[in-house]
Amino acid sequence: MSATRSQRSSTISPARPRRSPATIPMKRPETPSSSHFSASPVTSSSPLLRSSPSPSTSSAAASSTAVASTKLKENITVTIRFRPLSPREVNNGDEIAWYADGDYTIRNEYNPSLCYGFDRVFGPPTTTRRVYDIAAQQVVSGAMSGINGTVFAYGVTSSGKTHTMHGEQRSPGIIPLAVKDVFSIIQETPEREFLLRVSYLEIYNEVINDLLDPTGQNLRIREDSQGTYVEGIKDEVVLSPAHALSLIASGEEHRHVGSNNVNLFSSRSHTMFTLTIESSPHGKGDDGEDVSLSQLHLIDLAGSESSKTEITGQRRKEGSSINKSLLTLGTVISKLTDTKAAHIPYRDSKLTRLLQSTLSGHGRVSLICTITPASSTSEETHNTLKFAQRCKHVEIKASRNKIMDEKSLIKKYQKEISCLQEELTQLRHGNQDDLADRKLQVKLQSRLEDDEEAKAALMGRIQRLTKLILVSTKSSLQAASVKPDHIWRQAFGEDELAYLPDRRRENMADDGAVSTVSEHLKEPRDGNSSLDEMTKDRRKNKTRGMLGWLKLKKSDGVAGTLPTDGNQSQASGSPSSSSKYTQTKTTRRENAAAIKSIPEKTVAGDLFSATVGPEDSSPTGTTIADQMDLLHEQTKILVGEVALRTSSLNRLSEQAARNPEDFHIRDQIQKLEDEISEKKDQIRVLEQQIIEIFGMTPYASDSLGMPQVLSKLTMQLNEKIFEHEIKSADNRILQEQLQMTKSENAEMQETIILLRQQLDSLAERQSTQQIAGDESSGKNIHNRNGEESEIYSGAGTPTSVMSLNRVFAQEETKEIYNETALNSQALEIENLKKEKMRLIEEKDELGKLNKKLTEEASYAKELASAAAVELQNLAEEVTRLCNENAKLSR
């Protein structure tokens, strides 16, 4: 008696006094529900109410869980969870009306004979993890093996249903623990592969809403061979626990909640979180391999409400809908326990319609009833216990679900993966034909890039030399300065014609003379003296041309006998300009030594030496502009030569790296380096001359003349840039044609070499066979005593054994050649197959690496999204706690 007393007091708050109970017999009393079904005393063999096992038998019952799960029939697992008295109930003076008598019995404080027995009773100190291990873990394990499972919480409002199912950050509820347990089971089952989908809905005022898709409102319930389902519900495939929990958190944001006088945050709707589990053997199985399909329903029911909640308006309508659905649920449970019931009203509410497959026995069911021990809600608690007692008598038959049709999503994905793999294989076979062409293109592209710089420099040099030979504006500018109405054509001299063929040189000289005379005749007759003088000068300098004129100016400049010096100095009228010009002439004479060092063999050297020019000539704007143009062209030519020699130097350096003992290559490298340094010195001298010529212009101090010179130079620069762009485009086209021609020539050379080798080998074989045939024919003739040695002369046809042997040898040679060609082709095909297999393996490895990186990236994104959701939940929880603290402090 004392032992029983101490056990009861351990589950009751010590701060609450209670009356001493009446004398209680040692055996287990009958419950009100059991007396309704049977008048005999309750025993352990009663089919309607299982008695509470003794401590000695509890361990045996726990150890035989696996055996019990294999039975054909079993009952709904019913557990009860007490919550402690709330501060509001304590302040109102409520006392404890119901308490847990051990782990399997609940008794009434005021009527100890009123007691109920269940599969497990949890007191207030019990954690949610302990509740999950006993009440829900077996259901979750069965769902992973293909057996449907349902876990739902039932109780009055503010009894702790949502706390039990969802929990909080420090104490997760049944739903988070089940999700984590599912992924743990997947990790520990490597022989099977799984596909998980989740859906989340609510039943609000008898209307089904999709919490994962806010646009899914007022959904309809349908039925097929697998059972009932919601049409149009969103199924989201999940890959990790964080992903699933983030979906739950997003769905909770759309759930309907409200407040009443007993609960600040009261659920105003039933919610059902469904986890659809598909599994099949890992790897590629047979086509007839079955797929397990099961659903795990985790349901948080809204609490039944009485008139004590004092709700009005919309809250009253919500409470009415909640009570109606819960009443229908109770009616369905009662009909299921009545063997004589002909009709079960599943369709009277949306909740029972969704639970039709579950309650009709297709799967395991665990009911967690949450109750409060407060005396103010004693009647509601009693009704909850009676509902739980009725549920305990519902029989179910759990069986593994298998689907053989095409409704399995995992089968659909597997077939799609197989189709994609076949397409990938076909693409690999198709791409093998293009690999050789692509490799050849890569090689040609690399060779083109190597030679591009040298070719560009060479083409640029050709263009600049062409411009220097064919274009001259010097004489026309001088003629325009003397008489603007007269325009003279510049004739080519012997120096320019030396670069042309003999026939073209004669034609050009004759054309120049004729054109000069014709232009004289076309001009008006005024200014005869000036024209005569200009004609004499032109005939005198006719054979010199531009280069000869420059050389003549050079000799005149050295003598210093030009009469225009004094005029120019007097015309300037400025001592500063005169002294500046004198200083410039002195500087240019000092650079004469450096100028003479430039070789005269090249065109650049001739033009460079010609620019020593008229040291004492008048520095007019046109003269200086022409000299600067000429110096710029010479600089470009030298730069092109430097680029060409640099490219040659790079190639020789590569050859020297391959053949370090070749002294001839080293000598060539040293020679090229000396030439490059010499060209660079010449470029520096030309740049210095350009600067000096620009400084000696008479417009340096005249602000009116300088813009004209600059505008002229700008126009010339634009014209040359345009010409350069056009010729660059032509150059690119020519380079492409040249490259194509080179590749064709290389292929033809390779073919010719191969044919020559084959011809040589055939000739050797033919000669060998001919010698062997001669020897054999000689032996045959000797054995036949000369009878066969006669030669019958005919009309050019072979009449001896030797001739016949030659014919046979030719036929054998053809056969050998054909056999050799076939062998070479077979060997080439074998090499191509090996190369193909190697490329396929490399592509597979790259595909695996890409897939791995993609999975890691998706997993990182999921973790980031889950972390963001957790942070948001924490922020909301902090806000809620702050609000509660503020209200409590008031």
Swiss-Prot record:
Q: Which Pfam families match?
A: Kinesin
Family matches, as SUPFAM superfamilies: P-loop containing nucleoside triphosphate hydrolases
Q: Which residues form the Kinesin motor domain?
A: 75-394
**Keyword annotations of the record:** ATP-binding, Coiled coil, Microtubule, Mitochondrion, Motor protein, Nucleotide-binding, Transit peptide
Q: Where in the cell is it found?
A: Mitochondrion
Compositional bias (Low complexity) spans? 40-66, 569-579
Name of this protein: Kinesin-like protein KIN-7C, mitochondrial
| Gene name per UniProt | KIN7C
